[in-house]
Amino acid sequence: MYYGFYYDWTYILVLIGVVLSLLASSQVKGTFAKYSKIRSYSGMTGREAAEQILRRNGIYDVQVTHIAGNLTDHYDPRNKTLALSDPVYNSTSVAAIGVAAHECGHAVQHFEGYAPLSIRGALVPVVNFGSMISWPLIIIGLFMNGQMSSFLIDIGILLFMVAVAFHLITLPVEINASRRAVKVLGNSGMLRENEVGGVKKLLRAAAMTYVASAAAMILQLLRLLILTNGRRRND
């Protein structure tokens, strides 16, 4: 069956997902750029803020490192490293401290055994495997007939659903890390009240990128279900 652009209205679902992702990405980049220009009153760098937050939470086995790139910051629970990017590591801006605090939030989650983080970590190998073979299985299934066709399509969709679940479980993980960041920055005095307000705006914008990503995945899954069900009805 031919699913060309002019005959397949479900491309609209993909387009909506792309637009949502682009808007969210643009918003977080703009907000980060704005608060990257504002020097924090404390004058702490992102690295110093991260190290202090970790110590405040009794975490002494996490290494704060530098990583190249822009907004490539992340916490790796496998080797307990907290990597801060070029605009964060040595920067004294409000944005840098906010991002560093957010990544520390993930380190604290790991330290405390935060369940959603553990679930997300367990899904990683399945998602990595599924992302490689889900679409090939579905495409092969669409060109076949009979029970084998349905079997391949169902397995492909199931693997894609795992990827959707991964994006959904990421939402509470990221939101919780941001809440921890805002709380510690306010309670520690590392940032003034108006500076914490800037961090809230930045982390809220960052959270929307994960919301947009999850929405895009759900829309792709919906499109898959519509196309495969339509194909089965025509068999």
Name each region found by the language model.
Residues 2, 140-155, 227-235:
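Membrane-interfacial helix-loop-helix connectors in multipass membrane proteins
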Residues 10-34:
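N-terminal signal-anchor transmembrane alpha helix
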Residues 124-149:
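Post-HExxH zinc-binding segment in Zn-dependent metallohydrolases
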Residues 1-5, 25-130, 165-235:
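Polar-ligand-bearing catalytic/cofactor-coordination segments
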